[in-house]
């Protein structure tokens, strides 16, 4: 058993693609946790999607043994964290389980907005932060400039930051020696009542729900009767273990340790991330602080292409929910798409990943509607409704006010691209709050309506700044504005899945752009298809998809004009009847046309 003084719990904070997972691989290699044959790149990124996209989505942990220069053996618990803005809650949980963090910055690119946000989270948890300059082997690396950036933007002294290259394996031992020197050992009383923080939980087909915990006080061993403090659910511990990165069962998890607990938990609600485990017979006086319910920010309708898949779709969502506390869903029906679910996500990347996992891991074919945000609607009789689906908006005469969510965005951009980025924010109805120049980079603070950001703001930001700008945002408040609901009618029938809420000033332009896109996407039918955008009873834009028609005069060689007219009239009658009963097939791209409607 390792003494508490010789334990170090730390995580790695880095922006997407700054080399965090590669650095973790090097730590595992140096500590000899896996043989060379067992090493695969990005060991901690276990999901296929994580490796393909090169991003970390779920928090992972690994226990390593390291013999330091002072001759002592230390136990490291490395908790790998996601770097993308959508997963900031997973980051805050991982950081709450640590005493220190490595701030990994790409020595060629410099500090990015996401790292700044995560750094502030780490400082709120009173963590010791060690800056590391990675990718020092790149020709474009400029360590001095990046050191100045860290000091100016993050406010951390960086003169002694370790220079390393995770790819080449240089500077790795130096980083680990620095971890031993600078990061404090865990505080906590082995004799006190058990308090263990749930960092993550996931579903395993053989073991049921596996719960990843950090023991703050006391210890956990098999046979113990435990209780979740927020959920008040009792369990009996069956097994405890650690990842080295292979799973290894151990006799007990002592104070300061990070490991997993298997206790017959059947659902993720049974062990919610951020809850505290304690003993039934000797409970702790209070749960660990700082945890909140995760609130989804972005909503979309997901529908199976084949309605027979509805039940398997529900089961797949429930299984994903086991691993993903932030995913929320409830049944919903649409006239156009049948039965499906309204799903809530942390952001667009989270939405894409969930949809991709459903299609890949559960072999489902899904149609998704355009994402929306939550609006507050004040009705004329004084009720406040939270609406995430535009189709559920009450009739216009019953609405007193619609309030849209506003976010505060921090955007880091090189000075060269400042103009286009400001123009983009202004175009999206942003209000500038602050601008700060620091050594070639500018930190912009803007207030933006969330529905302007949720569609394609990130893509546009990357394209106007050649990929150099980065952004992090948080919800600020709800604000009332002149918002209207726009309906799309196909042959006079409302298509509920394409309704959306827009600002009155841009509604006509957006309506015109959307019907033009739909005209190009809806395939031609045997009858004419009218596409209209309407606000209330007023049609603001219209396009038509022309009918396909058979040449009914092909057999008439010369002959009487009245014969030809008769055939044409007969065809016209048939088309009219078809239009009354005909059903228009709407392709999946059409439902996402809303997303692209303002690409100019």
Swiss-Prot record:
Listed name of the protein: Elongation factor 4
Catalytic reactions on record: GTP + H2O = GDP + phosphate + H(+)
Topology of the protein relative to the lipid bilayer: Peripheral membrane protein
Species this protein is from: Acidithiobacillus ferrooxidans (strain ATCC 23270 / DSM 14882 / CIP 104768 / NCIMB 8455) (Ferrobacillus ferrooxidans (strain ATCC 23270))
tr-type G domain segment(s): 5-187
BP term (GO), one: positive regulation of translation
Keywords, comma-separated and alphabetical: Cell inner membrane, Cell membrane, GTP-binding, Hydrolase, Membrane, Nucleotide-binding, Protein biosynthesis
Binding site for GTP: 17-22, 134-137
Organism domain of life: Bacteria
